[in-house]
Amino acid sequence: MKRTDNIALIVAAGQGKRAGEGLPKQYRQIAGKAILAHAIDNLLAHPEIDTVQVVIADGHQTLYQEAVGDRDLPQPVIGGVFRRDSVINGLKAAHDRGYKRVLIHDAARPFLPKTVIDRLLDALKSSKAAIPVLPVVDTLVNQEVEAVDRNLFHRVQTPQAFDLETVIAAHQAWTGSDEPTDDAQVVRAFGKKIALVTGDRLLEKLTYPADFSVAEAQMTEKMISVCGSGFDVHCFEAGDHIMLGGIKIPHDHGLAGHSDADVALHALTDALLGAIADGDIGTHFPPSDPQWKGANSTQFLEYAVALAKKAGAIIDHADVTVICEAPKVGPYRPAMRKHIAQILGLPEQRVSIKATTTEKLGFTGRKEGIAAQAVTSIRLPDILC
């Protein structure tokens, strides 16, 4: 892909204490994904944005990595004491990478329509700076409760777009005694005119606890519910235990397989892969590959969960049925349920582990092996919306 010389900078070094729940708001999840990840993905999806540079607080490295997963991004930059310090650090990183234009965005704005980015980049063709704004619709009064003409004011949003050299020079020249509320204020003080483009109501900043409930509802209303099913079989062989649902169960036989032959986790992995329509366990972990010889099947399910989350999925429920005459599954059901719930990120109440027999019919009835079937329920973004 041809480089456009446009980079996005997300300032995510704040603590966000007004949002509640202790976790910095940029790392809280809506619709199964960190707010920061939503902001990153919206920017990366635009064909005129080359990459996204994120600025984080020192000590947030683990939170950041959990939020972004395996997205192909530059290493995060550590922020400073104040927002402007963080912006400067991010701008330096963008400059070092040779970019010419930058879009500076708040991490706490998970909704970003492509049309807003289009308008900002178009404005930069004839201006050194551009910001998205909306009209003020509420009545405004001063502290003496005197009406103020709202037509003289705009609500300013992000991302704010700048010629990179200009915004760096503006920050270097800033002499204000107070911290600026945004970067447009810094550039305006530097004597540059700011172009105004139409923003979007979706670009609301998440600040207070109630904002997150609204954002969750907005995000999930554009999702569809889908199911996936999986089935697996392994025959018995010599051994003294089997792996089932990630739990070691003593038995007078083992299960034959290239990996640890955990039929429950294999069926569940296939169910999750089926829900996101991404092949099957054999596609991702072929038995012909020696690296999976004797592998713990927990990693297969963890991999499927990561793929599902990358696809924007919310996992809602899992149901596993083990089919065998022996061993007895009941005593190990709570441990299996707990193990699977932890991998899926679900409460145990949303994981069902059942066991049945075939009334001595077929290969399972003859105690020749074990079968398992699984169903998962998830929600995915509706690509047609």
From Swiss-Prot:
Q: Where is this site: Transition state stabilizer?
A: R18, K25, H258, T357
Residue numbers spanned by region 2-C-methyl-D-erythritol 4-phosphate cytidylyltransferase = 1-226
Report keywords, A-Z: Isoprene biosynthesis, Lyase, Metal-binding, Multifunctional enzyme, Nucleotidyltransferase, Transferase
The EC number(s) this enzyme carries: 2.7.7.60, 4.6.1.12
UniProt keyword rRNA processing, yes or no:
no
Known catalytic reactions: 2-C-methyl-D-erythritol 4-phosphate + CTP + H(+) = 4-CDP-2-C-methyl-D-erythritol + diphosphate; 4-CDP-2-C-methyl-D-erythritol 2-phosphate = 2-C-methyl-D-erythritol 2,4-cyclic diphosphate + CMP
Q: Which residues form the signal peptide?
A: none
User: What is a GO molecular function of this protein?
Assistant: metal ion binding
GO terms classed as biological process:
isopentenyl diphosphate biosynthetic process, methylerythritol 4-phosphate pathway; terpenoid biosynthetic process
Region annotation 2-C-methyl-D-erythritol 2,4-cyclodiphosphate synthase: residue ranges? 226-385
Binding of a divalent metal cation: at which residues?
Answer: D232, H234, H266
Pathway involvement? Answer: Isoprenoid biosynthesis; isopentenyl diphosphate biosynthesis via DXP pathway; isopentenyl diphosphate from 1-deoxy-D-xylulose 5-phosphate: step 2/6; Isoprenoid biosynthesis; isopentenyl diphosphate biosynthesis via DXP pathway; isopentenyl diphosphate from 1-deoxy-D-xylulose 5-phosphate: step 4/6
Under InterPro entries, the record lists: IspD, IspD/F, IspD/TarI, ISPD_synthase_CS, MECDP_synthase, MECDP_synthase_CS, MECDP_synthase_sf, Nucleotide-diphossugar_trans
Homology family: In the N-terminal section; belongs to the IspD/TarI cytidylyltransferase family. IspD subfamily.
Output this protein's name: Bifunctional enzyme IspD/IspF
- Organism encoding this protein: Zymomonas mobilis subsp. mobilis (strain ATCC 31821 / ZM4 / CP4)
